[in-house]
Amino acid sequence: MDTQGFSCLLLLISEIDLSVKRRI
């Protein structure tokens, strides 16, 4: 498992989650 890719994916998910919360 690629830890660097996993952390990057987590960062992307958290950023999308923030944008979704801002829209609502």
From Swiss-Prot:
- What sections of the protein cross the membrane? none
Q: Where in the cell is it found?
A: Secreted; Cytoplasm
The organism is Homo sapiens
InterPro entries cross-referenced by the UniProt entry: Humanin
Family indicated by similarity: Belongs to the humanin family.
Query: What function does this protein fulfil?
Result: Plays a role as a neuroprotective and antiapoptotic factor.
Q: Which UniProt keywords apply?
A: Cytoplasm, Secreted
Q: Name one GO biological process term.
A: negative regulation of execution phase of apoptosis
Q: Which GO terms describe its molecular function?
A: receptor antagonist activity
Report the protein name in the record: Humanin-like 13
- In which broad location class does this protein mainly occur, judging by the first location in its UniProt entry? secreted
Coiled coil ranges (UniProt) are: none
What is one GO cellular-component annotation here? cytoplasm
